[in-house]
Amino acid sequence: MSAEHVLTMLNEHEVKFVDLRFTDTKGKEQHVTIPAHQVNAEFFEEGKMFDGSSIGGWKGINESDMVLMPDASTAVIDPFFADSTLIIRCDILEPGTLQGYDRDPRSIAKRAEDYLRSTGIADTVLFGPEPEFFLFDDIRFGSSISGSHVAIDDIEGAWNSSTQYEGGNKGHRPAVKGGYFPVPPVDSAQDIRSEMCLVMEQMGLVVEAHHHEVATAGQNEVATRFNTMTKKADEIQIYKYVVHNVAHRFGKTATFMPKPMFGDNGSGMHCHMSLSKNGVNLFAGDKYAGLSEQALYYIGGVIKHAKAINALANPTTNSYKRLVPGYEAPVMLAYSARNRSASIRIPVVSSPKARRIEVRFPDPAANPYLCFAALLMAGLDGIKNKIHPGEAMDKNLYDLPPEEAKEIPQVAGSLEEALNELDLDREFLKAGGVFTDEAIDAYIALRREEDDRVRMTPHPVEFELYYSV
């Protein structure tokens, strides 16, 4: 879509406002709204100035001016605002050069795609992420000098089997780890997910399926079609926006936290990906599970750099409460056909055109632009340096005896470990100027602040364990 088409949309839809959206370092969407009459052809060349110092990890107050540059191809009508509003996604540019800001996640993703093409290895990378989420009825939390607390409730929660409700308790709720695929009334979110699908498609996503996920208390997934990398990251931001707002309409609250509840499965964001050149899938071949040698090298790069990638793909302290054995979380850095206990799976496909790999350790707290870019850069490093991943692991990795398990590398065990690994293993990200040292340092500093706060805050379980010592 061109700027001319956007100007036509403004008239055809009697648009009153234009909502300029961008994504901060942590992955949260931000926005500023302007009257539609402010938008003309020059607007798409000059953009809009804003204060970058107010965004965590970005500019200092002494050099705060930045440019929101609208990407006309992303224009879509907002389905939630009362007044007709057009959403346009923006890149963050430096005002002096009008080049992509080195810490802008969307600009980083676009540079990664440019770098891919510059290598001559491929011209297209496709991503098919699968973010999971929870829908709750009530969430209360807080932390202060006098104490910390969190309380979750949902009509589907297995703990509510004996709860007294006005009108009676109707039962029909999924057990712990028992939520996968039951029909209503056990699956109480059918209509909510259907509405999410309709709104997502209204906003340009292609929905392939939706279903209840494994965990009790409202874990769900909506599956959408793959796309090129930056476009798919844009779609993940739309996906989250729709999930949050449709949930709100239904009187629910949605979360993409990786592990909101102890004792049941957490939420992942498995990432399917493949490379192609001139329309030919480069991951299809005659090696293991129908993969090409390039695909194996790509896997080798992801495994080699996995702990550094964890800092971007699993970016919260909560992420590492999911990445533990026993809850279908992929902690072993191995690859396998069909085997979901491996961190990298090769799905069964009906045609070589669909041949791909699935990296299973990312979670939906990740900034999609940074997560996808890091995975791509690791894979390209694997191809360039012919990093073979070793033999596939087709046995159930969850059941390995300890002496075998210790021979297989694992993902980072904590955010602190992941950030340390990113600090040490960053050169693959800097190839082609995709990530800069300044961007990586700022990201690490931002996440260390969170890690320090969690580490220094007394936890209720500590009182259970140690109060009476």
UniProtKB/Swiss-Prot annotation:
ATP binds at E208, H272, M273, S274, R340, R345, K353. NCBIfam families: GlnA (TIGR00653), PRK09469.1 (NF007006). One of its GO terms (molecular function) is ATP binding. Mg(2+) 1 binds at E130, H270, E358. The modification O-AMP-tyrosine is found at Y398. InterPro entries: Gln_synt_N (IPR008147), Gln_synt_N_sf (IPR036651), Gln_synth/guanido_kin_cat_dom (IPR014746), Gln_synth_cat_dom (IPR008146), Gln_synth_gly_rich_site (IPR027303), Gln_synth_I (IPR004809), Gln_synth_I_adenylation_site (IPR001637), Gln_synth_N_conserv_site (IPR027302). Residues 105-469 form the GS catalytic domain. It comes from Escherichia coli (strain K12). Residues 13-97 form the GS beta-grasp domain. The activity of this enzyme could be controlled by adenylation under conditions of abundant glutamine. L-glutamate binds at N265, G266, R322, E328, R340, R360. GO terms for biological process: ammonia assimilation cycle; glutamine biosynthetic process; nitrogen utilization; response to radiation. Its main location: cytoplasm. This is Glutamine synthetase. Mg(2+) 2 binds at E132, E213, E221. Binds 2 Mg(2+) ions per subunit. It is an enzyme of class 6 (ligase). Keywords: ATP-binding, Cytoplasm, Ligase, Magnesium, Metal-binding, Nucleotide-binding, Phosphoprotein. Catalyzes the ATP-dependent biosynthesis of glutamine from glutamate and ammonia. It is found in: Cytoplasm. Belongs to the glutamine synthetase family. It catalyses: L-glutamate + NH4(+) + ATP = L-glutamine + ADP + phosphate + H(+).
